[in-house]
Amino acid sequence: MFRHHPTRGRRTAGLLAAALATLSAGLTAVAPAHPARADTATLGELAEAKGRYFGSATDNPELPDTQYTQILGSEFSQITVGNTMKWQYTEPSRGRFDYTAAEEIVDLAESNGQSVRGHTLVWHNQLPSWVDDVPAGELLGVMRDHITHEVDHFKGRLIHWDVVNEAFEEDGSRRQSVFQQKIGDSYIAEAFKAARAADPDVKLYYNDYNIEGIGPKSDAVYEMVKSFKAQGIPIDGVGMQAHLIAGQVPASLQENIRRFADLGVDVALTELDIRMTLPRTAAKDAQQATDYGAVVEACLVVSRCVGITVWDYTDKYSWVPSVFPGQGAALPWDEDFAKKPAYHAIAAALNGGSPAPGGNCTATYRVTSQWQGGFTAEITVGNDHTAPITGWTVTWTLSSGQSISHMWNGNLTVNGQDVTVRDVGYNGTLGGNGSTTFGFQGEGVADTPADVTCTPGRPSGTSA
């Protein structure tokens, strides 16, 4: 994974031209983006039907783009202020506050009936230089004053605040920011206390990257949240940024969301994008669509996962290419505002796993090894349509004397000799012409059954 860049980034003209040229050269290999497809509901509406929100970050330089703001205002139920609530914008010199740019975005969201997430009060990046010069004995008071002033200014207008952002290193140790060095471990708790005193109603979040899966960094955040809850420190939620790489969605994402929720806090996926190595191809689009669907499903399974925000919605304004040369195409809309397969995978996942119209799946059974009394087999599940499917069920009949002793990447049910295997959530969404595999170890004589079938979607009332 990677370190989150201090700004959301913007391509230079040269990078943009190069990326467009690369995409143009490889365009025939890219799955159709379906720009004219009429979807029955927006992502925001589909999420609201599930008791969630689906939002986008935005930034002030993008707002004059009328095509951009039309989609921003109609497709999403939530907006995150991407840059202009950060310290360098809101208190550029000590004691002088300026909320003009942030208010422009909040006003726009309110005019569209969208909720707003504040981002972010305390962060080691995008600090004005004067903060570094504050004496150690004064910094806690300065931090409290900054939080109090900004939270009070937007009181009643926001649903969430990212109070502290990215305070941990990859190994789980505390990042040695100016706040950590001059105030110490207590600064995070003190920041939450100050924010709660300024607004008793807004939900207060800790936000970080590379905490989507279980590991040293997420373990450290987990222990901090657990400690805060035990001490009565006012923390309401954890934001998992989810800057991901296609094909590398953490297998423990759903489990990790659930363990934080079990502490009694909400979880939000706050900065979702899934980048790929350019140029785009149909296969890369399919993998990305699968990954977006899997992330959405992981959130939907856990009731306290309250919503998802993409880190802007169009590749035109993605931060990725300016930070990771040769990578990009990370968002559900392309640079021309056409919906990519990822968009339809998100919609399908939010829509309860119903297969896209005309969607179908195939199952190809292959014996991979055999020995006296046993064998292993692999089944490839494929989507033979350009629209994504969410959920699949494969069935077949075991031959006489066969049984299954172990399975991976599938939920197994056996009734007599009848086998039913369903997806396990993370491998349930298949982009257009995408595929996944599961396998098992069997006992008995290996053969290839003639009645292998695949059905897209999930039966009513079931979940991965």
Curated annotation (Swiss-Prot):
Residues 40-349 form the GH10 domain. InterPro entries: CBD2, CBM2/CBM3_carb-bd_dom_sf, CBM2_carb-bd_dom_sf, GH10, GH10_dom, Glycoside_hydrolase_SF. SMART domains: CBD_II, Glyco_10. This is Endo-1,4-beta-xylanase A. It is an enzyme of class 3 (hydrolase). It comes from Streptomyces sp. Belongs to the glycosyl hydrolase 10 (cellulase F) family. Pathway: Glycan degradation; xylan degradation. Its EC number is 3.2.1.8. Residues 1-33 form the signal peptide. Completely inhibited by Hg(2+), unaffected by EDTA.
